[in-house]
Amino acid sequence: MNDTKDNKVYSSARHSKYWQQLQTLAESPWSLAALFAQDNTRTQHFSMQAGALYMDYSKQCIDDAVLENLLNLANSCELAARIQSLLQGAMVNTSEERAALHTALRLPATASLQLDTQDVVADVHQSLLQVERLSERVRSGTWRGFSGQAITDVVNIGVGGSDLGPLMATTALDEWADTCVEVHFVSNMDGTQLDNLLKHLNPETTLFIISSKSFGTVDTLSNAKTALSWLLATAKLRAGTEDSVRRRHFIGISANGQKMSAWGIHPEHQLQLWEWVGGRFSLWSAIGLAIAIRIGMSGFKELLAGAHSMDDHFAQADFAKNVPVLLGLIAVWNSTFLQVNAHTVLPYDGRLSYLPSYLTQLEMESNGKSVTQHGDRIDYDTCPILWGEIGSNAQHAFYQLLHQGTQQVSCDFIACVRRYSDEAKNTPLQQQHELSLANCLAQSRVLAFGNAAIAESDGQVACDADKYKYYRGNQPSTTLLLDELTPHSLGALIALYEHKVYVMASIWDINPFDQWGVEMGKQMAESVHDAMQQERGAQFDTSTNQLLKHIKELS
């Protein structure tokens, strides 16, 4: 059990009778072909619409009994109360004693939410106003570099949530861009990305955004230091000063204003984060500045509005018709009860190319835990291994394993129904879009039913002479269809997955808002780096010592 700021103590789903009933149900053999054969209304029963998003989960290995027990399981851990605690600013991040109020970042200005006597909504909209002012200065050409030229390129330097979120969103919404200012992203600490990028940029017209919640992330600050050196090398030739370079070519986004100032970020160019915003939930905050620069503030506000619409649905819809709740419960059923320990995200839309990477971080960093909120070791499976790729590329990469391998894998198919303008009907581009949709539906069908069941349903005779051509089927999947990809629908889609993560964490009784598993490696890297600089032999394990010795011999 865990205590929130309002001293609410929640029940554990693990010890409810519904958990045991689901374990019993999971022991039965599940056949998707049989489930569809038994009920010709199955798809209508296991599908629903929420705003511009349609979800078909009929190809999951569930029936009415499983769904009823999953919903009862959610009630047994007081999921409704947990959702309200999240939305109202209770201390749901128990290990760090913080709220997790990413949903407040998309509340309308007319709303009010108090946290420690402070009106969070007022603070959020003050920050959004600053984002708007800075982004419009860049977009309009009034922001000038040290030589007086307008900014043509913006480089977002960040890692994790400070990189993946803005990168995913700007890529997805690039056709909404209404500026000639290009936006780039750098995250890798080895300098390769930055070095390759700087070769093609003009230092006099390049602006850098340093995004780091702590403003102490070594990956980010090492790239920022290199960027500063690159700028200063040109500024000296143009009689520019270091102060003018820092002032005209850097914006900082962090929860640590003191460190931003110490680095040299001008106070007017510092954007605030709050401790109650987790990195992987932060694209809605000032971290989204790169998005606002690329698609404009009106587009960014539509992104926020789409997410808020999903927040409302999550908070108000009955669980049986609640898309995030159902998506989360199905994920728990697959991972914990059916032992489906791998999950893949398959968007059939090139604009969503970074969505799988974004969701990999969102789910695995949030729910990759083995201890409950009250410190007990977990005796059940939690977050599956998650990966993904654009569907058409994945078909030529790992679909072989999905169709004919030995691993059980659950899948999310994501596609957009409408693409291109009405004037583009029956053009080659429109035909390509229809071909992509056809592949999306076809692949989910083959994964679900295999060649034997499909042949039978189509009135054909299945041939089993060539065993190597056998498609076993019975791979569970959910299909999510957006009416079309817009800032609003993308916001709703991202928020859907955020809430899915929270539902799963609530059932598993884990904290999805911390990430202690990333800390020790970073700390150890400091010791290893120190050892690299010293002449004497390192004092680690024999493998690490030998690797260091080899590196030193070649350096």
UniProtKB/Swiss-Prot annotation:
* Keywords tagged on the record: Cytoplasm, Gluconeogenesis, Glycolysis, Isomerase
Cell compartment(s), UniProt: Cytoplasm
The UniProt entry, under InterPro entries, shows: G6P_Isomerase (IPR001672), G6P_Isomerase_C (IPR023096), Phosphoglucose_isomerase_CS (IPR018189), SIS_dom_sf (IPR046348), SIS_PGI_1 (IPR035476), SIS_PGI_2 (IPR035482)
> Quick one: which pathway?
Carbohydrate biosynthesis; gluconeogenesis; Carbohydrate degradation; glycolysis; D-glyceraldehyde 3-phosphate and glycerone phosphate from D-glucose: step 2/4
A GO cellular component annotation in the UniProt record: cytosol
The residue range of the signal peptide is: none
Which GO molecular-function terms appear in the entry? carbohydrate derivative binding; glucose-6-phosphate isomerase activity; monosaccharide binding
Under Enzyme Commission nomenclature, its number is 5.3.1.9
The protein's annotated catalytic reaction(s) are: alpha-D-glucose 6-phosphate = beta-D-fructose 6-phosphate
What is the active site of this protein? 365, 396, 522
Q: Name the Gene Ontology biological process terms.
A: gluconeogenesis; glucose 6-phosphate metabolic process; glycolytic process
Protein role: Catalyzes the reversible isomerization of glucose-6-phosphate to fructose-6-phosphate.
Similarity comment: family membership = Belongs to the GPI family.
Which PANTHER family does the entry link to? GLUCOSE-6-PHOSPHATE ISOMERASE
Designated name of the protein = Glucose-6-phosphate isomerase
From which organism does this entry originate?
Psychrobacter arcticus (strain DSM 17307 / VKM B-2377 / 273-4)
